[in-house]
């Protein structure tokens, strides 16, 4: 059992240690051998730790390169879309000036910020769609919240009601989310589960 442990921990280095003990011929060979093996084990662990850290640093470096490339691609895509929008607005302006109508100028919005807003609103509405509102009422009070559409807690929302949730404009979806937050502030005991 001891030989298996030594072979597993030190491998061929044990033979090297015994050869060194034979060459040096210290006064206490067992103590010398123990010191040599302890030192070898300590340096082997340090080398393994350094190797693992280098691997981790290499992974982090590769991930940061990927993120940098993705950010650059998104910037290029945003620039291309912005240029397309400017080109379309320019052509629309030329067409309108040829016809004689002058519409109000439309401000150009950053595509990235509008995409982020849309993604944020979609994530918020998905959370509302996945978890139906569960409201607790105090004894003697009504379960109705003024100005909020009510659902029966025992019935599943129908497919048509789910479709209605998805067909609203971002402003309507945002308005519904704000209404829900206001309702929770008005009735603090009726919080939905996280």
Curated annotation (Swiss-Prot):
Family of the protein in this entry: Belongs to the dpy-30 family.
Protein name: DPY30 domain-containing protein 2
CDD domains: DD_DYDC-like
GO CC field: Set1C/COMPASS complex
Organism: Bos taurus (Bovine)
Region span, Disordered: 126-172
UniProt feature, compositional bias: Low complexity: 149-163
Gene name of the encoded protein: DYDC2
């Amino acid at each position: 059992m001891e030989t298996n442990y030594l072979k597993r921990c030190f491998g061929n280095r044990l033979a090297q240690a015994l050869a060194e003990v034979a060459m040096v011929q210290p006064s206490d060979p067992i103590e010398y051998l123990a010191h040599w093996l302890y030192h070898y084990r300590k340096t082997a662990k340090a080398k393994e730790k350094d190797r693992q850290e280098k691997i981790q640093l290499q992974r982090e470096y590769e991930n940061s390169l990927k993120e940098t490339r993705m950010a650059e691609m998104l910037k290029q895509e945003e620039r291309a879309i912005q240029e397309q929008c400017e080109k379309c607005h320019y052509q629309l302006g030329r067409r309108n000036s040829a016809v004689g109508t002058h519409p109000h100028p439309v401000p150009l919005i950053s595509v990235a910020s509008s995409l982020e807003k849309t993604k944020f609103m979609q994530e918020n509405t998905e959370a509302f769609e996945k978890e139906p509102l569960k409201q607790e009422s105090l004894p003697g009070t009504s379960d109705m919240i003024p100005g909020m559409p009510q659902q029966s807690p025992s019935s599943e929302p129908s497919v048509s009601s789910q479709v209605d949730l998805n067909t609203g404009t971002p402003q309507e979806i945002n308005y519904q989310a704000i209404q829900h937050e206001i309702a929770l502030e008005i009735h603090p005991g009726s919080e939905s589960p996280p």
